[in-house]
Amino acid sequence: MIKYSVILILVLTNIFGKEGYFINPIISGAHPDPSICRVGDDFYIVNSSFEYFPGLPIHHSKDLVNWELIGYGLHREDQCNGKMNLVDVQSDGGIHAPTIRYHKGTFYIITTNVYNSGDGSPGLMRNFIITAKNPSGPWSKPYIIEGAPGIDPDIFFDDNGKVYFTGTHSPGDMNANGIGEIWIQEIDIKKWKLIGNRHTVWDGIFGCCTEGPHIYKEHGLYYLLVAEGGTGKNHAVMIAASEDILGPYEENQRNPILTTRHLSNEYFVNSTGHADMIELEDGRWYMVSLGKRNDLDGDANMGRETYLMPMQWEPTIVKWEQVSEDRWEPLRYLFPVVAPLTGKVERFTPLPYADKPQYINNTVVDDFLDENLDLRWTFVRVPEEKTYSLSENPGFLRLYSKPGIIQDRKRFSLVGFRQKESDFEFEVKINFSPEKDKVESGIIHYQKEWNYLTNTVTKVKKKYYLEQNLKEKSKEIVTLKKTILKGYDGNIILKVKSKKDKYDFYYSLNKGSSFIYFTSMDAIKTVSYTHLTLPTIY
């Protein structure tokens, strides 16, 4: 077993906003499908995490613009190695679209584990709930909700004591996994079972990819918020209202209430959708949604991120009702108007709290002296028991090499963090002296098993080489550059400088006194169309 040690230094661009304004996104670097709740003056957001572990990242804020990662809903292997599987889950599977809510002293997260066994059998969409008294954890084991099809579930606590599960199903069949229509059913949260009848309540406005439902009760009405149009550039947020939670729901005639589908790639963000709403203590309202930056011809290596917009409620005519033989009167419901002055997500928006400015500090320096790995580090799937150590060589993260190559459904010695900006510097000090040939260690810009860029040190016949390899979808791995490391003594510093659309790579063999330029690469080679890019140690 080959062992190697690393120290990380990462400097991302620190961003300062205009006085009195905050900058979107509020949570950068692959934090899609945000759901938000408030307890007093504390706000909490949870996001999708797909096949990555720990899963379900939870952020905390006092002001809606400065967010701190405080923990994960899925943070133990025993939560993820049964019916809820993050051990050998396929790429793009795993945890989809959670909802976080607080009720009578307990936090609830409800979400879906999408799992495909790979043997040709139908894929599974297992909806489950976890609970905690403290949002930073520990969180409970997953409670699987049997017989609940679809993805993106919501849990709603009505003021009459009933609790409702809201989910999706394929059009025309309320027992079929998929998206397109929204269903509601009462749930017993003591037994974790659905009870009563199931009701299909809405298929959205245009009937395309209706998903991501959330239920609210305001102004004497039940509101059903959904995402529609797919998670690409036609993404949008729609809303409907009803006097009964089971419907019928009246569509807001001003839908969509949020979208960027009408904006060009010259705007800073696209694909906004999959939203949640929150009321502040003073009665004001805000919305969070996902969005994707337009850094690379409509895409970005940060994937889908979390954005914040103000909103307000305004009366809207939903239909005309006949009140007498010759008289009709309008029926008006209050509906949200998002970003009331512009109707779109803004890069700069007035602060929710004028006395609480935003400061984004993206600098990370990890000397690995703590007993536990920093919360920002992420694995692809649940790591095997002997993947890393912080105690074997204090002050270093020791990774243990594993046989084979990076491939779908496998677990490998790779740990990284979410790329948060297009402009950054990433530096890793590596101690690597393998006994065997063709063992490699270095850094990876990892998008998926089928799309990544490696810069690694490799030993071949007592000589050490630095080489760059690119894996693109549907293509074989290609070596782009290879150079012999003259004078290599087992220690090297690898550095990446990123500037929007290009990565420049450097290395140092003299403890950082000077760096040698290695090569460059267009960032679009590992562009994250939907999920994330992980600058990683490998």
Model-derived features with residue positions:
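Short carbohydrate-recognition loop motifs
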Residues: S391-Q407, E467
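Short, aromatic/His-centered strand-loop micro-motif at the edge of beta-sheets
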Residues: E472-I493
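Blade-edge beta-strand/turn elements of extracellular beta-propeller
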Residues: E19-I26, W67-R76, N81-D88, I130-A148, ...
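Beta-propeller fold recognition
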Residues: N24-G29, L296-E392, R398, K420
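Carbohydrate-binding surfaces in secreted/extracellular proteins
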Residues: F368, V428, I493-S520
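Secretory/extracellular carbohydrate-interaction modules
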Residues: I406-K462
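Single conserved hydrophobic/aromatic residue that forms the stacking wall/gate
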Residues: H531-Y538
